[in-house]
Amino acid sequence: MTHPPFLYGTAWKDERTAPLTRLAVEAGFRGIDTANQRRHYFEQGVGDALEGLYREGSVTREDLFLQTKFTYAGGQDHRLPYDPHADFPTQVRQSFASSLEHLRTDYVDAYVLHGPSVGRGLSEADFAVWKAMEALCREQKARVIGVSNVNLGQLRLLVEAAEIPPRYVQNRCFAANYWDREVRALCSERGIVYQGFSLLTANAQVLGGPEMVALARRYRKTIAQLVFRFAQQVGMLPLTGTTDINHMREDLASSTFDLTDDEVRLIESVGAS
């Protein structure tokens, strides 16, 4: 399936993951982002929620866009979804099989490398993991593949080396660097969809400024709705992890109005010094 206009992020919800995932789907979200990283996610909780919704007939698997991730051992706690002594292709296979079991599915719509193993450049491990993910994609167990927490140089290296290029890039998005403009530009050039997370929490200090407040009043929208609409209008696929049902509904309503080109430029530069 093609991706929906919004993704619901399930990080840092622990035992509330299942009820909040259910709430999000009932509110109208059709895209769910998770990871097989028990340290920050409870992937099985997502599956528990979906199993109940499927059983009730509220949605079908085909209605949903499910995205999960492979996370290196350095980003995990002791609850690893694979043998840390195995080679990287085996770790990917084991983690992926565990994800399918957690999510009660035989495929995922997007499988994402949670982040490179090094801060600069890409390692042999990264290339080995990517090849394993490409194999899952060829088998159609992962419809597409992507990468998260990546800088411009790393993304360039990956797209040049990959046989199957990333369909998605998911990054924390800071207004201070024009909402990751350089990475977004490369994504646009290469036909990659940019997913932005922490759009609100990473930018709280600048989003309460007078320009944003005035714009919110003009449209009678919340600051969050302005940010998410801006994101959509610049070609971004935004994530929200709100736990509030009213905020869920407001976030989904972000696509009901359009900002002018000047207003888009204003928001794009709101955090730049």
Name each region found by the language model.
Residues 1-68, 128, 132, 202:
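N-terminal binding-site loop/beta-alpha segment at the start of enzyme catalytic domains
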